[in-house]
């Protein structure tokens, strides 16, 4: 339920086995969105106990693929009718009456950049905290290395800060950080091009020329959330 994919190597315990340490529960999705789900059950129980008559039926739906495209919802709609009214109890107060539209894009390209393997991101709707790359040639970039970059032989890694795609400004995108660094070497033309489309620290889509904002919903958010290179094929994901 509302569980983002987990990279086992980034955990000191099994992410899918809840573990309590120092009065805190550790596990992937331990909070999201368990409290509100339980609150709905208690609310329905309270209505029933109080004998409050309902003019309409109430159906409680729990989906377990929300973080990866809600394919379970498609199955549900193929077997049951869409409810006339739906609300999701996962927001804050005051009541949220507006939600941004969402667009996810995937792109692929055969790259000539001297990259053996590039790996970053596990979920399309999250700012990745880690990015790593293995190179097939010596790196001759001019960018300042900075504390986020570590180098070990022909392997480079960037340590950023994870964040939800809806609030990317609170994170540090490891993909764009590493792309910016690699792009300072003329041999990494595709990395440089991507760094221009997704400037490090920019989250409003300015690099793509799509930045916009309004009073109610605020600024558009745009992140490169996943990027991988295998056998010369570059694949990426953009969350808008």
Regions found by a protein language model. Give the residues of each.
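Midchain, well-structured core segments that form catalytic/ion-binding scaffolds
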Residues: 67, 74-75, 79-240
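Short helix-loop-beta-strand segments that form the rim/entrance of peptidase-like active sites
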Residues: 47-66
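Structural motif
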Residues: 23-24, 58-59, 84-87
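Short glycine/serine- and small hydrophobic-enriched flexible loop segments
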Residues: 42-49, 179-184
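Acidic/His- and Gly-rich active-site-bordering loop/insert found
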Residues: 1-28, 49-54
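Active-site alpha-helical elements of protease catalytic centers
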Residues: 29-44
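Short glycine/serine/threonine-rich phosphate/pyrophosphate-binding segments
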Residues: 36-37, 69-72
């Amino acid at each position: 339920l509302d569980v983002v994919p987990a990279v086992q190597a980034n955990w000191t315990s099994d992410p899918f086995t809840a573990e309590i340490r120092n009065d805190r529960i550790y596990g992937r999705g331990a909070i999201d969105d368990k409290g509100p789900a339980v609150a709905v059950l208690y609310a329905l129980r309270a209505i029933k106990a109080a004998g409050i008559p309902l003019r309409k039926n109430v159906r409680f739906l729990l989906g377990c693929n929300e973080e990866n495209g809600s394919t379970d919802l498609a199955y549900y709609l193929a077997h049951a009718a869409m409810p006339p009214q739906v609300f999701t109890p996962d927001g804050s107060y005051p009541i949220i009456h507006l939600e941004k539209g969402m667009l996810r894009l995937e792109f692929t390209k055969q790259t000539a950049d001297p990259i053996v393997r590039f790996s970053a991101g596990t979920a399309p709707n999250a700012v990745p905290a880690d990015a790593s790359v293995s190179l097939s040639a010596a790196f001759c970039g001019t960018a300042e290395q900075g504390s986020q970059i570590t180098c070990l032989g022909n392997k480079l890694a960037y340590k950023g800060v994870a964040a939800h795609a809806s609030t990317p400004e609170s994170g540090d995108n490891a993909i764009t950080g590493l792309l910016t660094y690699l792009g300072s070497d003329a041999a990494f033309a595709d990395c440089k091009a991507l760094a221009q489309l997704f400037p490090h620290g920019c989250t409003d889509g300015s690099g793509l020329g799509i930045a916009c904002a309004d009073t109610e919903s605020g600024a558009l958010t745009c992140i490169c959330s996943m990027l991988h290179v295998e056998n010369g094929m570059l694949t990426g994901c953009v969350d808008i």
